[in-house]
Amino acid sequence: MSTTRHTITVWQNAGQRAMAMDILDEEPLAIRVQGQPYAVVMRTPGDELAHAAGFCLTEGLVDRPEDIVNLAACNTDDTNVVTVTLTPQRRDQIAGHLDRRGYISQTSCGLCGKTLIDEVMQHLQPVQSDVTIPLAAAEQCLRNLDQFQPLRRSSAASHAAALFDAELNPLVVMEDVGRHNALDKAVGRLFLDRRLDLAKVVVMSSRISYELVQKTVRARIPIILALSRPTRLALDLASRLGVSLAGAAKPAGLYIYCHPQRFVELR
């Protein structure tokens, strides 16, 4: 569990007291591709190889595990570094992409400095899937997400990304200070295990940003469920790329924002 115990001062009922609290860790992860710095992301330490693999997939650097010749972590006192070596063929295919290195990701925004939706659309193919899930079961996945969030229970500061199969069986759950990092870690874990094709549903503890839609499309997952609502750009991108978006309604139920055909009511 990546937290650090810290003593804080609590002010309640006109009085003060000291209390120990678990604070979520946040550190930089440098991702090097072909021996050159490519990205620095601020994240919760842990699952570095899965994180880097998922980042490379969802950012378009790789399409298959076989595109990666070597994936290795190097830990030092000051930072964490993961090096990614691609096959010569893949390196040549994405030479222009590699020239855009210098991606800096903050925990609140994984697309800092990136171009907007029109450029994103040029590099993505719509998701084609006839998978359907029951409405009630989809809502239950959202309501039960906190059961898979030990970091959130201890720190109250992390996001979670959970991937489910077509029968809504959980495949992997990852937590991180950044919602996009949590998704990269979850996708990367299944990608390295060669099980990503089983994933049909993403469940997020956060709002749905267009970056999360982009990453989900790269992973070829047709459905996103989230506790909070999507942004307008996220909804636009999902509508155009065939991803179903739904979120938790209050006090119960679902808000279905686009492609509702994948949600069915069992009778």
Model-derived regions: residue spans:
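Feature captures the catalytic cores and cofactor-binding loops of soluble hydro-lyases/lyases
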Residues: H180-E265
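Phosphate/diphosphate-binding glycine-rich loops and adjacent basic-rich segments that engage nucleotide
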Residues: C109, L266-R267
